[in-house]
């Protein structure tokens, strides 16, 4: 390993520092006086500098949730590729693909659950907030809940489509089925899949088929967990919707007041113009009267 000897340079710096230290001592510089001039012991002499209010500690949770959601998006992209490979007809063993699908599914579900847990902890921390901070916390949590809900709903839809393909169901939803609650439909299919695995185990069917159905059941369990989390987050999203409705109402009222103020301003402007004309007319009348008086005085003389 190559290196350079810097001992000489270090000695030069040390000697230079000693030289400057002696010069400062000769000039009468006292470090204690310098410290006293910078830091006052008397609180009366201290100048209070007003600092900006720091952001609440719970705001930092947004970065953690963003990181988790970014990780879920990456894993979902990988999972989509595995789904596409697995549904292709093939006579080869797909155990490795099924294990990878199961691993990614569990990891994505756990990331969404971590997001929900962070949201619950943050909500507990903001319960003591009052005034404007409470309003800000409510809007902040509602926004995060909406983002988590959107991401989890998209993932649940992908899982449901894949599960229907595995179960031999039609993944394309008909117009009649689209009117039904998708969450209830997905949960019903998932529960049916789990019950079918239990029935196959009781009947002692082929181990290979049972193992395949267990992998499918894991996906079904993930759908049920995400559906439950979706319902929990819906409460915060509804609160955000109510808040948005109130904001829209306030905006509409502001527009009404602005139009009313514009009308009043137009009236005031017209009154001001009329006042100027009236003053000019009065001035002309006074001028005419003055001229008549002057003319009358001249005639009398």
From Swiss-Prot:
Subcellular location field: Golgi apparatus, trans-Golgi network membrane; Endosome membrane
Parts of the chain on the Vesicular side: 301
Ranges facing Cytoplasmic side: 1-279
SMART domains from the UniProt entry: t_SNARE
Topology of the protein relative to the lipid bilayer: Single-pass type IV membrane protein
Domain t-SNARE coiled-coil homology: 206-268
Pfam family, one: SNARE
Listed GO MF terms: SNAP receptor activity; SNARE binding
Claim: Transmembrane is one of the keywords in the record: yes
Top-rank lineage group of the source organism: Eukaryota
Statement: the UniProt record of this protein carries the keyword Coiled coil: yes
Coiled coil: 92-120
Spans through the membrane: 280-300
BP GO terms, sorted: intracellular protein transport; vesicle docking; vesicle fusion
GO cellular component: cytosol; endomembrane system; endosome membrane; Golgi apparatus; SNARE complex
Keywords: Coiled coil, Endosome, Golgi apparatus, Membrane, Protein transport, Transmembrane, Transmembrane helix, Transport
Family of the protein in this entry: Belongs to the syntaxin family.
Purpose of the protein: t-SNARE that functions in transport from the endosome to the late Golgi and on the endocytic pathway.
Record's protein name: t-SNARE affecting a late Golgi compartment protein 2
């Amino acid at each position: 390993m190559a290196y350079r000897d810097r001992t000489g340079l270090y000695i030069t710096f040390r000697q230079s520092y000693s030289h400057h230290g002696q010069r400062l001592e000769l000039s009468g510089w006292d470090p204690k006086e310098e410290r006293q001039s910078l830091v006052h012991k008397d609180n009366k002499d201290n100048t209070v500098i007003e600092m900006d209010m720091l952001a609440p500690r719970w705001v930092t949770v947004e970065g953690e949730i963003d990181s988790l959601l970014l990780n879920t998006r990456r894993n979902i992209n990988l999972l989509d590729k595995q789904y596409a490979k697995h549904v292709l007809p093939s006579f080869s063993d797909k155990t490795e693909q099924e294990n990878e699908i199961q691993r990614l599914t569990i990891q994505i579900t756990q990331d969404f659950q971590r997001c929900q847990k962070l949201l619950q902890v943050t909500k507990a921390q903001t319960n003591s907030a009052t005034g404007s901070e409470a309003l800000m916390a409510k809007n902040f949590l509602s926004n995060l809940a909406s983002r988590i809900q959107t991401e989890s709903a998209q993932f649940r839809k992908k899982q449901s489509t894949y599960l229907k393909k595995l179960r031999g169901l039609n993944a394309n939803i008909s117009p009649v089925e689209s009117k039904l609650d998708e969450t209830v439909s997905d949960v019903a299919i998932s529960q049916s899949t789990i019950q079918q695995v239990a029935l196959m185990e009781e009947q002692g069917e082929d181990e290979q088929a049972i193992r395949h159905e267990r992998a499918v059941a894991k996906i079904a369990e993930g759908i049920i967990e995400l559906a439950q989390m979706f319902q929990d987050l819906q409460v915060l999203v509804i609160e955000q919707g109510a808040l948005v409705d109130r904001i829209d109402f306030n905006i509409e009222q502001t527009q009404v007041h602005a139009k009313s103020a514009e009308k009043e301003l137009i009236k005031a402007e017209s009154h001001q113009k009329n006042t100027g004309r009236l003053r000019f007319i009065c001035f002309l009348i006074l001028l005419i009267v003055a001229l008549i008086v002057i003319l009358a005085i001249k005639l009398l003389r």
